[in-house]
Amino acid sequence: RLTVHQTHFFRHVPSLDLVAEQWLPAYLARGEVDAIHAWSVGCSTGEEAFTLAMALDRALDRLTAGKAYFGITATDISAPALAVGRAACYPRAKADEIPVDCQARYCEPDEEDSFRIVDALRRRVGFVQFNLMDIARAPLKRLDLVYCQNVLIYFARERRVALLDALAALLKPGGLVVLGPGEVLGYTPASTVRLGGPQTLAFQRT
């Protein structure tokens, strides 16, 4: 049983840019997509899931004038961490991790020393308890995007490869799995191609 709670908003901007600026425009251009279904794996207290929601919301607003829907399932093994994510309330100091334009659009004061994510964005993220070691029983199928950063690093390489294979198998054709840079080196899952540059690690389903 592995629990990891250290997380931040906008932790790895190059990965977010890969999703919003490179993958998503090309994926939408296929003409077969009217909604993006994403999985934030090992979401801890929700910062990464809400960061991904901000990135998708801004990008879809720009690319589709907000006509394309998106939803994120955020999972973690820790019930206390998930409770924080569901509350969507964070210490005021954490707002400094969020770009100013996103603060204005997606954050609102809660109490003197805290802020919360606005309801419109919070409703796009559902928090569910799930143990990644039970990946064979994952309730999610045919996903557009799997975002799994700084989770696989805690496993031995053989287990990392097996988990990456399982995550990639859940993608629709053209879907993307995003890992933290360096989490799985020298390996590409079957039926995928590497996408992005040296600062990112992502694989697109063919």
Over which residues does each language-model region extend?
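Conserved AdoMet
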Residues: 1-41
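A structural alpha-helix within SAM-dependent methyltransferase catalytic domains
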Residues: 20, 53-57, 168
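Conserved class I S-adenosyl-L-methionine
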Residues: 33-51, 71-73
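Extended basic-aromatic, gly/pro-enriched interface segments that bind polyanionic ligands
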Residues: 41, 62-147, 151-161, 185-186
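Conserved SAM-binding loop of SAM-dependent methyltransferases across substrates and taxa
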Residues: 45-64
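A short glycine-rich, Lys/Arg-flanked "PGG" loop and its adjoining helix->strand segment in the class I
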Residues: 161-173
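Conserved beta-strand signature within the Rossmann-like core of class I S-adenosyl-L-methionine
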Residues: 173-181
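Core SAM-dependent methyltransferase catalytic element
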Residues: 186-206
